[in-house]
Amino acid sequence: MKARKRVGPLWIALACVLVLVAGAGAWIVVQNDFAVREVRVTIPGPKQPLEAVLALPTEGKGPRGLVVLAHGDGVADASRDGFYRPIWEAFARAGYASLSWNKPGVDGAPGNWLHQSMSDRSAEVDAALDWAKRRPEIDPNRLGVWGISQGGWVLPKVAGDRTDLRFMILVGAAVNWLRQGEYNLRAELQDQGAPGDRLGAELRRRAAQIRLLEEGAGYDEYLASRLDDPPMSKDRWGFVLRNFRADVTDQLPRVRTPTLLVLGDHDRNVDVKETEAAYRAGVPQGLLTVETLRGGSHSAARYELDTPGSVRGLITYVAAPRSLYVPGYLDSLTDFVKKHGR
């Protein structure tokens, strides 16, 4: 009888590694499987078509309620690189579909988002809501909106102009464009441990930039000032020039729908105390709910995961994207929509 060959330690170790890799791969697949069905649609926009994704719940029967999403600042495709999928799923648990689109000029969408005003963005949301009301899979009597960051200068106008919204949800919304910019500048310098003379220099530079904006300076004049190194692009300067006077204060008394304001206590972009005070003073009584997320960042993510260059954040984004958000945030979305979106 031939003796059996012994399996060496190297092969055992290799087998263990393969099992672990397979298990990790299966885990990642499961964690990135969301209870929504994504359908690509084109919406007739006010200036150009909107290339959008309609995320429909995979469970239950239609027609569905609908949440229209409004992006924050910066380049954004319909899913915000996948960050919206846990949010879509949270709305799906309440029986609601979600609708979001590539910003103009992103992923082949026509136009250029840097050529837009906040009113232009509000008009896009209105167009999307009107389009959705004619869709057979959408219940035209159950509509809501969700917006993050810069979306806070977009959606209150929509919520004041329309009578067909069941709710509005805002995350990390600011009040005044210029005050928000200064708060963010101070917070970033504080995080860097910058000395006082550096802060003073940056505030003087900012004041000079604001003077140019108030004078309506063209791009060549801005470049000649040499205030920024590197300077903004021509399109970005135009975007700031178009929007730097944004202030939501006058819009808040016109809001006529239940509103959930979500604020992170570690938001370094927005002065959440100012935002909460303005909304409590402005939104009509009985319509506002404020939720402050402990350990929450500007985007309602866990602060420790939402910092530039965070390896833990990247791993969580890939392996467990729902866990990026502060525990309870996604459930709050579901619960608020269930309560007000029936």
Model region roles, listed by residue range:
Residues 27-62:
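N-terminal cap/lid segment of alpha/beta-hydrolase-fold proteins
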Residues 63-72:
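Short beta-strand element of the alpha/beta-hydrolase
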Residues 76-87, 103, 273:
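The serine-hydrolase catalytic nucleophile loop
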Residues 88-108:
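Conserved alpha/beta-hydrolase
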Residues 115-136:
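Alpha/beta-hydrolase active-site loop
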Residues 131-191:
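Primarily recognizes the serine-hydrolase "nucleophile elbow" in alpha/beta-hydrolase
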Residues 169-251:
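Accessory cap/linker subdomain of secreted extracellular hydrolases
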Residues 255, 261-263:
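Short beta-strand/loop motif that positions the catalytic acidic residue
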